[in-house]
A protein has these predicted regions:
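Residue-level detector of anion-binding/catalytic polar loops
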Residues: 62, 181-182
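Basic, flexible linker segments flanking DNA-binding modules
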Residues: 1-94, 192, 249-259
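RNase H-like two-metal-ion nuclease catalytic core shared by retroviral integrases
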Residues: 5, 72-75, 161-163, 169-173, ...
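Mobile genetic element proteins and their domesticated derivatives, centered on retroelements
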Residues: 14, 32, 52, 56, ...
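Active-site beta-loop-alpha junctions of metal-dependent nucleic acid enzymes
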Residues: 107, 111, 129-152, 168
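C-terminal domain-tail junction helix/linker
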Residues: 177-179, 203-265
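An active-site-proximal beta-strand-loop segment
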Residues: 88-127, 133-135
């Protein structure tokens, strides 16, 4: 008589995690292990990462490789630049202290969609998001507007960017000044690794949400807006396992930080 597989309950729990959100099928062994620890399913002893990987392999839960996008902003050599205040130190001890911002582009059926976001270095959360069919400075201004509307305590924070002309524009600088936000820029317009934090986040979004899942050139820019907004504001911020946060989604890490201070997030 066949004995039941000792990892059947674990495999079922993994399948449940995989099916909870469309993008969870990109979880590798580390994030799957962290998701199991966070959810702590009843009656299941969580094994080692290595065993988690073996069971994932056995039941066919494998994630796809990532492709990395290239930076698209172009420097305005004549414009006034701001100092590099972060100097590649992207770790923050508390929320709304250090942030990074960038733009990426996605080809659509009716043109290109440009996506701008502000990420918090503390927990990788998206504080502000804006999307337009052009790369004008108002795109970055609207990103700041949305971030400040959602997080008024952003006043006094550092927001770091590359030296693209959108970020050296008077429109963007005036928005920073209006909200009391401090500007920081890459030390050299040619050093893309200074903004690697944002590039990494764009790569994750494109890999998990778009690549091998949708043909973006068959979707309109409006359809893409809905997908991307839902991915970042709902999934990324609240449910996506983030290994850099010790396996916690950004808002859970933030909530625990404020709880440790006796404050509400």
């Amino acid at each position: 008589k066949d004995r039941p597989w000792k990892y059947q309950d674990l495999a079922d729990a993994m399948r449940a995690i995989n099916s909870e959100d469309e993008c969870n099928d990109t979880y590798g062994r580390i994030r799957m292990y962290q998701a199991l620890l966070l959810k702590n399913p009843t009656g299941i002893k969580i094994p080692s990462e290595r065993t988690v990987y073996r069971v994932m392999d056995e039941i066919g839960l494998v994630h796809r490789p990532k492709r990395k996008p290239n930076g698209i902003t172009k420097a305005d050599r004549e414009a006034r630049k701001s100092d590099d205040l972060l100097k590649r130190e992207f770790k923050a001890d508390k929320p709304l202290e250090k942030c990074v911002t960038d733009i990426t582009e996605i080809k659509a059926k009716d043109g290109k969609l440009y996506v701008s976001a502000i990420f918090d270095c503390f927990d990788s959360s998206v504080l502000g998001l804006a999307m337009e069919t052009n790369m004008k400075a108002t795109l970055c201004e609207h990103t700041l507007d949305n971030a400040y509307l959602a997080h008024p305590d952003l006043r006094g924070a550092i927001v770091h960017s590359d030296r693209g002309r959108q970020y050296t524009s008077e429109t963007y600088r005036q928005a920073l000044s209006k909200y009391g936000i401090i500007q920081s820029m890459n030390s050299d317009g040619g050093r893309c690794h200074d903004n690697a934090r944002c590039e990494s986040m764009w790569a994750r979004m494109k890999s998990e949400l778009l690549y091998d899942r949708y043909n973006t050139e068959s979707l309109t820019t409006d359809e893409l807006r809905v997908l991307i907004w839902r991915y970042f504001i709902s999934y990324w911020n609240n449910r996506r396992i983030c290994s850099a946060n010790g396996g916690l989604p950004p808002m859970i890490k933030r909530q625990r930080y404020y709880q440790s201070l006796g404050l509400a997030a």
